[in-house]
Amino acid sequence: MAGYPLPIKHLISELGKLPGIGEKTATRLAMHILRAPEGDARALADSILEVRDKIRFCRVCYNFSEAELCTVCRDSARDSSQICVVEDPDALMAIEDSGSYSGTYHVLHGVLSPLDGIGPEQLKLRELVERIRESGVREVILATNPNVSGDSTALLISRMIGPLAVTVTRIAQGVPMGSDLRYMDRMTLSKSLEFRRGMEKEP
């Protein structure tokens, strides 16, 4: 990268900060942007700025939204007695794409990961408990990924809401251990929701 002008180096460096993008891929993307028509390059830059300026968290479920409430929370046809707890908006969209769920969601924006410095305070857990207390929720479906961090987070949530009068369920173990909900096919995801199992709550 030593021979590139400084603006190109900066672009490669910024692209390289994206997940899964190494220096070679970042360089290839930078070259593509440089060779693209000016209108395309500006449209890309404008889209990035638009996302940063216009997207916020839904005040109810913490999904991404352009408005105070996301499209799911604005939909009066959704079953508000169910909350499906997911790690991130990507998992929410995967479940929506499966067409197998008609309730509401709560997005944690992460899972417990002590090595990464992520504890309960960094997740939307307190907001979840408050939401359950203040609404007529009857079932909380824990749809964190089936791995150590996801299972630990699900267990903590089940303990936190133990004193509340709600049923707590976990997506079925037909979902392979260590897999990611974002990349599952629709049928597998649909079945994991259909055959979800109850979790014991601590008083």
Swiss-Prot record:
Keywords associated with the record: DNA damage, DNA recombination, DNA repair, Metal-binding, Zinc, Zinc-finger
Give the domain of life.
Answer: Bacteria
Q: What residues does the Toprim domain cover?
A: 81-176
- What does the entry give for GO biological process? DNA recombination; DNA repair
Q: Which stretches are zinc fingers (C4-type)?
A: 58-73
Iron recorded as keyword? no
State any single GO MF term: zinc ion binding
Q: Which HAMAP family match?
A: RecR
Chain's role:
May play a role in DNA repair. It seems to be involved in an RecBC-independent recombinational process of DNA repair. It may act with RecF and RecO.
Tell me the protein family, please.
Belongs to the RecR family.
The name on file for this protein is Recombination protein RecR
Show the taxonomic lineage: Bacteria, Pseudomonadati, Thermodesulfobacteriota, Syntrophia, Syntrophales
